[in-house]
Amino acid sequence: MKKCFSFLLTLLVLLAMPVSAFAADDVFTPAQKAYYKNLGLQGTTVNVYNWGEYISEGQEGAMNTVKEFERLTGAKVNYTNFESNENMYSKLSGGGVSYDVIIPSDYMIQRLLEEDMLLPLDYGNIPNYDKYIAPDCKGLYFDPQQKYTVCYNIGTTVLIYNKKLVKEAPKSWSVLWDEQYRDKVLMFNNSRDAFALAQFMLGQDLNTTSEEDWNAAAELLAKQKDAVRPVYVMDEVFNLMESGEYAFATYYAGDYILMQDNNPDLACCFPEEGVNLFYDAMCVPKCTQNKKGAEAFINFMQEPQVALANQEYIYYASPNLAVRQNEDNSLYGNPVVYPKVWPKGQYFYNLPQNILELQNDLWARVKSGQLSADGKAQDRRIYWASGAVGAAAVLAVSARLIHKARKNKEQNLRDLY
């Protein structure tokens, strides 16, 4: 990595102070400003599709990443959010949209590549990739030849709990099935993450292609719905968990840090059964209408100042070496975000189409209650009621036929006489 580290460290120490303490023009070097100005993006539009609460947006004196990119390039950024990889995929695959930068997770990137929905990147337009991206974030399993992605963040799932509402610190996902916490559990509202918790409990491979395994995991989630009545949420978890009303939530490590900042009664653990380890990465979909602008945005997100501001705001582990090596970084050495030893875990891989369809069907049935004991009882009541109605109908038809046969026989006898 060719850079003057001492200069960069000094710069980052200064930048660890609130960005509002500086004039906007002082944040970036003359060379950086000249680079983005000379790209010729003035008057163009860059459409960015990212997770909610997943970029530094200018609140509380933080850098407004999008506004700074617009200021340096003269381009306009349309920035929109999705709640899950599956929602993002549905929007993208449905057609009629044009996104230039998307930031999905590892297994979804695999799917997009398998379905030929991504464009290869021109890394010559992303010089910060070679300058700053850590070796452990290159050639990742979902893009082994490093053609389509630039790592955005690294994270894990965690079990978040409220110390005031929980008797002792949990060690296992099993507490999410404990009836004493009925109506006090917030669960993932996306199928892949929710199923993973049940799969960990059952000792399954998160990427199993056994339909029997998926059905068993669905049954366990249905039992949870009966016993605990969890609330299924995504971005809503922030307000709900910070309010102090819920005992447990399943979410992501970086987001836990944000919640804990607002409610010091919150804590988290890596459950002993394991966690999902994941990477999110920036990609350019084939529906792009501004690939040059997309690659400029991807490069901008790895400028040392931007990467630091982003990490300081969203609290996820950065792939950027300049951020990782900055000892004044507020998360430097944080055991949740940058653990010395990563917890036991598994990565998600893209699943075969038949398993994806089964997963989606089972998830819909879990949430609707069709797989729960109550739902099955209702189904049995409907079945028996339907059977009774059917039997009554058969008897009625039979009676009419017998009656008609008797009338015909009587008429035939009259005709004889």
Name these PLM-found stretches.
Residues 17-27, 401-406:
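Sec-dependent signal peptide cleavage junction
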Residues 215-224, 262-286:
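Periplasmic-binding protein-like
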Residues 109-111, 242-243, 248-265:
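A ligand-binding cleft/hinge motif common to bilobed small-molecule-binding domains
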Residues 342-417:
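Conserved C-terminal helix/tail region of periplasmic/extracytoplasmic solute-binding proteins
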Residues 23-111:
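Early extracytoplasmic/lumenal segment of secretory-pathway proteins
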Residues 99-103, 230-231, 247-252, 267-268:
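Paired acidic/hydrophobic, glycine-rich loop segments that form the ligand-binding mouth/hinge
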Residues 47-62, 83, 97-242:
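Extracytoplasmic ligand-binding site segments that recognize negatively charged/polar headgroups
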Residues 276, 280, 285-346:
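Mature extracytoplasmic/periplasmic domains
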